[in-house]
């Protein structure tokens, strides 16, 4: 095992559960499905020691998910599954998820907040004030889907600048509703406090030079390893970083050290 493959990686963007989208075929939905044990098995096979998940039950089907029920399931499942931590999902259209998040963020298995404006069907700009106020009061880490039309990266920038207590992870480097692969990186360049990061969980990661370009623009310190497991292959996402055209010092930051610095003792 080479020196990079020997690093026990931390995946900051995973899921578990049943994938359900009405516009997809049954075989497609089946292929995107994986329970907690399967997520851990795939991670362990490529030396990913910890995966931070949100439950698909809290996100899907699109516009119909009950985030509160999904959060309750995650608290139970993750507590009994070594190798996992979880985010609590807030859906601002379901006010009860704020109170639920307040309680769950005090629990050792819950390390942050997950937002998904696309699956829950709301423009982030209409709810960002309350979401960021809530997260700032708790000095919470927030992982959000980006950059489709309800979750434009540029719409997060003023709030990240206004609330430096919030550490924000923009998911899916290279994702863009308009085909532009630069949204996450450009948003980070506009942020003033060093409190915004991006993860590698996009399917766009397979593009040659995308991850390398992102590092050249914002530094490896702002890039976190994510897989979007079980939707995408953990092994493929791990290999993309292991074999990136980057110095080993940068790979180590992306795979592990940045997450350790960001989440700290919450990962214990």
Whereabouts are the PLM-identified features?
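Alpha-helical scaffolding within the catalytic cores
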Residues: 31-41, 69-74, 97-100, 152-157, ...
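Active-site gating/metal-coordination segments in enzymes
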Residues: 64-143, 147, 205
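Divalent metal-dependent hydrolysis catalytic cores, especially in the metallo-beta-lactamase
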Residues: 26, 34-61, 83-89, 111-112, ...
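Conserved, mostly hydrophobic/aromatic
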Residues: 13, 43, 74, 104, ...
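Histidine-centered divalent metal-coordination motifs
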Residues: 10-17, 116, 145, 172
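Mid-to-C-terminal alpha-helical segments outside catalytic/metal-binding sites
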Residues: 1-16, 21-50, 220-222, 231-268
């Amino acid at each position: 095992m080479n020196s990079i493959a020997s690093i026990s990686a931390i995946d900051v963007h995973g899921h578990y559960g049943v994938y359900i989208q009405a516009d997809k075929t049954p075989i497609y939905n089946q292929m995107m499905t994986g329970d907690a044990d399967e997520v851990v098995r795939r991670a362990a096979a490529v030396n990913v020691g910890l995966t931070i998940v949100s439950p698909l039950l809290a996100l899907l089907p699109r516009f119909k998910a009950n985030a509160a029920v999904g959060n309750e399931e995650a608290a139970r499942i993750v507590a009994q599954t070594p190798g996992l931590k979880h985010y609590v999902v807030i859906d601002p259209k379901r006010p009860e998820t704020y109170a639920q998040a307040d309680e769950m963020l005090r629990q050792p298995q819950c390390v942050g907040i997950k937002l998904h404006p696309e699956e829950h069907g709301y423009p982030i700009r209409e709810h960002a004030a309350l979401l960021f106020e809530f997260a700032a009061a708790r000095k919470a880490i927030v992982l959000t889907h980006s950059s489709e039309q309800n979750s434009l990266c540029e719409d997060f920038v003023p709030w990240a600048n206004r609330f430096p207590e919030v550490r924000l992870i923009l998911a899916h480097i290279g994702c863009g509703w308009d085909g532009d692969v630069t949204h996450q990186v450009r948003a980070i360049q506009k942020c003033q406090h060093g409190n915004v990061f991006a993860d590698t969980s996009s399917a766009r990661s397979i593009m040659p030079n995308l991850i390398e370009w992102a590092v050249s623009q914002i530094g490896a310190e702002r890039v976190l390893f994510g897989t979007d497991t079980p939707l995408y292959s953990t092994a493929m996402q791990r290999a993309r970083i292991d074999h990136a055209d980057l110095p080993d010092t940068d790979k180590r930051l992306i795979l592990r050290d940045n997450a350790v610095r960001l989440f700290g003792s919450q990962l214990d």
